[in-house]
Every structure is written in C-alpha cells, then in structure tokens.
UniProtKB/Swiss-Prot annotation:
Top-level taxon: Eukaryota
Functional description taken from the UniProt entry: Required for the assembly of the mitochondrial respiratory chain complex IV (CIV), also known as cytochrome c oxidase. May participate in merging the COX1 and COX2 assembly lines.
Interval spanned by the transit peptide: 1-11
Topology of this chain in the membrane: Single-pass membrane protein
Ion transport among keywords: no
Annotated PANTHER family: CYTOCHROME C OXIDASE ASSEMBLY PROTEIN COX16 HOMOLOG, MITOCHONDRIAL, MITOCHONDRIAL OUTER MEMBRANE PROTEIN 25
Gene Ontology cellular-component terms listed: mitochondrial inner membrane
Species annotation: Gibberella zeae (strain ATCC MYA-4620 / CBS 123657 / FGSC 9075 / NRRL 31084 / PH-1) (Wheat head blight fungus)
Keywords, ordered alphabetically: Membrane, Mitochondrion, Mitochondrion inner membrane, Transit peptide, Transmembrane, Transmembrane helix
Transmembrane segments annotated in the record for this chain: 30-50
Name the UniProt record assigns to this protein: Cytochrome c oxidase assembly protein COX16, mitochondrial
Length: 115
C-alpha cells in the first residue's frame, strides 16, 4: 500500500497565482501573518485616536482661557478688601468648641463603616 503525501497536490497554474505565492511567503516568514497586521493596527489606531485626544485638549482650552483686561479689572473691583489684622480677629472671635458631628449619607452600595 503506497504512502500518501502530506502535501496537497497543486498544479503549476495554482502555484503561480498571487494567493499561493503569498501563502508560501507566510509559511517561510510568519511575520507577514502576525507581525505585519499587528503593526498595521497599531499605526492605524494612532492615526484614528489622534483627533479624539485633540478634542479633549480643545475642550480644556475652551474652559480655561486668558482674561481680557476689562474682565480682570472687574474681578479685582468686586473682590473683598482683605486686611490681615481684621481677618485674624474675625477668625479668633469664632467659637470653634461648639460643634456637632453629623453623619454624611452614603451612596447606595458604599460601605458606611458601621459594624
């Protein structure tokens, strides 16, 4: 009884096709099957995610902006004048010994610390 070959028979026309040449290259160089697609996904992901991170920084720039001179002057005028001695006496006059401890309501599922 003859032994069967482990390789499939492929005609010369099949061997010259682009798919067969690529399959032979993948067998010889596994980088083409695993490494190249991985690197392609990493590089493409970088290009796709760049605009997403730019949106984050643009939103921050809109929130934090430089004030104009007029806005700056209005903020300074509306601020309360602070004198160190007056602040000291105001804080010293407060009664810090008369206070009551109150529990804060916990969120659902949060440990309240009670046994």
């Amino acid at each position: 009884m003859p032994a069967f070959q482990s390789k499939k028979f492929r005609s010369a026309a099949d061997m010259n096709s682009i798919g067969m040449r690529y399959r032979n290259l993948m067998n010889k160089h596994p980088f083409l099957m695993f490494g190249l697609p991985f690197l392609t996904v990493i590089v493409a992901g970088s290009f796709v995610l760049t605009p997403a991170t730019a949106v984050r920084y643009e939103r921050y720039d809109r929130k934090v902006r430089q004030m104009t001179k007029d806005e700056e002057l209005n903020v300074r005028r509306s601020a309360r004048k602070v004198d160190m001695k007056e602040e000291y006496y105001r804080l010293a006059g407060k009664d810090l010994d008369d206070w009551e401890q109150k529990r804060v309501k916990r969120l659902p599922g949060e440990n309240d610390g009670l046994l």
